[in-house]
């Protein structure tokens, strides 16, 4: 009987967890740009990890043209380099790199985190704006 109640409670908690994520996604995700969206400027983002992708997505949604530079051959930053059994040590509601990210568990593993990075990347059209295997050694401002 108690085991059954815990199972029901667990289901309710997971449902609420997914509802909260959906709420965050719908109300806080910036809209992806349209093809006709005016561009205000061009910004270089260094690194295609969680912070770089999140920053680039927000910049794109606010009208900036973006180029992402990363010295690695793929996105993911630290999460790409850790082993596949690594997972979050905190609840994923507190580890939201972008409102669009949607996790199926409280403590997602590396592959789910990388999948969410790819989702943000493609949703905002950033997959066409990345220069992989490119090390940034100098920065100059262009007018």
Feature annotation, model-predicted:
Residues 71-119:
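Glycine-rich active-site loop/strand segments that organize a redox cofactor
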């Amino acid at each position: 009987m108690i085991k059954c109640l815990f199972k029901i409670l667990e289901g309710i908690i997971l449902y609420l967890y997914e509802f909260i994520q959906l709420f965050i996604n719908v109300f806080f995700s910036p809209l992806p740009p349209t093809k006709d969206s005016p561009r205000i400027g061009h910004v270089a983002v260094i690194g295609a990890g969680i912070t770089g992708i999140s920053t680039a997505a927000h910049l794109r949604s606010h009208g900036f043209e973006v180029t992402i530079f990363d010295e690695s051959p793929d996105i993911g930053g630290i999460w790409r380099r850790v082993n596949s059994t690594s997972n979050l040590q905190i609840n994923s509601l507190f580890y939201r790199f972008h409102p669009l990210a949607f996790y199926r568990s409280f403590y997602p593993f590396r592959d789910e985190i990388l999948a969410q990075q790819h989702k943000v990347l493609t949703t905002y059209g950033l997959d066409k704006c990345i220069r992989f295997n490119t090390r940034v050694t100098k920065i100059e401002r262009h007018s």
